[in-house]
Amino acid sequence: MDIRAAEISAILKDQIKNFGQEAEVTEVGQVLSVGDGIARVYGLDNVQAGEMVEFENGTRGMALNLETDNVGVVIFGADREIKEGQTVKRTRAIVDAPVGKGLLGRVVDALGNPIDGKGPIQFTERKRVDVKAPGIIPRKSVNEPMATGLKAIDALIPIGRGQRELIIGDRQTGKTAIALDTILNQKPLNAQPDEKIKLYCVYVAVGQKRSTVAQFVKVLEEQGALEYSIVVAATASDPAPMQYLAPFTGCTMGEYFRDNGMHAVIIYDDLSKQAVAYRQMSLLLRRPPGREAYPGDVFYLHSRLLERAAKLNETQGAGSLTALPVIETQANDVSAYIPTNVISITDGQIFLETDLFFQGIRPAVNVGLSVSRVGSSAQTKAMKKVAGKIKGELAQYREMAAFAQFGSDLDAATQRLLNRGSRLTELLKQPQFSPLKMEEQVCVIWAGTNGFLDGLPLNKVRAFEDGLLSLLRGKHADLLNTIRDTRDLSDDSAAKLKAAVEGFAKTFS
């Protein structure tokens, strides 16, 4: 056998030279057609559903339709630079987003990239945006209150940590205002050192004007609430895939707190725009349309998102994620496709009405149509005691007010009922950016249901409330502290409160 030394040495030299160098194998495909934010790609045979792919110019997309001969990719960005015949490569990663406390105080887009000009985000891990919701075993029934600071909601439609409560109403009825007040109301809780008390906030803006989002962030900053909040924005000028993805990204960021034994609330503002973006994508991907041209799985789109809000049991760390989805109706039509879907998924709804808004009843909550299916079990004892009475009296008032329009001669009892009801309705009004603590709400509602407002003219109710609150905060701070600490209105506290309110009522004119 003939051994050639030169040949062997050449092979050895070559192997030594290339030692440690690994060839990178990427699976690439070709763009067949592109338009309207959708690219058809040939050749990505092993791509996964929901996988991120990268185009030649660095633009990213997500593989949604896996067909026999091509892949339908939605593009996260402008499709102007993408041409037919360009290469597309797999990233082998399902769409994910950064999570952690480093995101607090920041504004990010639907992929988790910062858009607030404050530099890169400090994060340690990334999580998939579309994960399975917790099963039945890790969950626990809702048992802690999630205070919004609004009397009309905390007393009549209470929300608990881990609940999904829908905020539904026409445009310009104050849906975002309720969400904003809820975030601002968490400021005292987030000042506490205990992580079990804190409630972090995630606000997802979908399809809104950039000016509106900027204004929202400005208010959060001015009120000192941005430091415990994350804002995820996919505005009206962003592509439909970004608007579709933003709620899932926000949810993943909120789940970080839930899974680490902390508490968070997430506001989706609003899901009707996400459904419209999903409809646009589905129709362009040639998926068959259903009712109102929405695809058949639009219910599943919202159910898999909202089911991720949960209260976990002690073995899982007892964390929670509360969801406040917002839905915009057209002309108060709650029976449209998307509103009925989301109503059936959530644990109750806060129904806002244009008529009430223009009558000056703000927040414009229709107490008759609004419900909370699980929140009452999370109400504090003190609030339960006073709220039960106000619910009954308002229900009677609504019934009588309808009849009173026809008859002019009303008996004294009916007149008394109408008188009390109109004053309680006045009492539930609340200006924006002025959330009340639980103990303050209890005292004010107690005064209303115990007849201290009955003799007042309607236009003096607000002044009475303000005066009573400043008296309680000043001279009776110990009473407020007792109610806050015990979460109950004991007979002793009720007697002290009665004496304080009676004394104030005598001096009030």
UniProtKB/Swiss-Prot annotation:
InterPro entries linked to this entry: ATP_synth_asu-like_sf, ATP_synth_asu_C, ATP_synth_asu_C_sf, ATP_synth_F1_a_nt-bd_dom, ATP_synth_F1_asu, ATPase_a/bsu_AS, ATPase_F1/V1/A1_a/bsu_N, ATPase_F1/V1/A1_a/bsu_N_sf
Sequence similarity: Belongs to the ATPase alpha/beta chains family.
Chief place where the protein resides: membrane
Compartments where located: Cell inner membrane
Organism: Bradyrhizobium sp. (strain ORS 278)
The reaction(s) this protein catalyses: ATP + H2O + 4 H(+)(in) = ADP + phosphate + 5 H(+)(out)
GO cellular component, one term: proton-transporting ATP synthase complex
Required for activity, annotated site positions: 370
Keywords: ATP synthesis, ATP-binding, Cell inner membrane, Cell membrane, CF(1), Hydrogen ion transport, Ion transport, Membrane, Nucleotide-binding, Translocase, Transport
Cited Pfam families: ATP-synt_ab, ATP-synt_ab_C, ATP-synt_ab_N
Residues involved in ATP binding: 169-176
Signal peptide (from-to): none
EC number: 7.1.2.2
Membrane topology designation: Peripheral membrane protein
Free-text function comment from the UniProt entry: Produces ATP from ADP in the presence of a proton gradient across the membrane. The alpha chain is a regulatory subunit.
Summary of subunit composition and partner proteins: F-type ATPases have 2 components, CF(1) - the catalytic core - and CF(0) - the membrane proton channel. CF(1) has five subunits: alpha(3), beta(3), gamma(1), delta(1), epsilon(1). CF(0) has four main subunits: a(1), b(1), b'(1) and c(9-12).
Protein name, entry field: ATP synthase subunit alpha
GO molecular function: ADP binding; ATP binding; proton-transporting ATP synthase activity, rotational mechanism
Superkingdom, taxonomy of origin: Bacteria
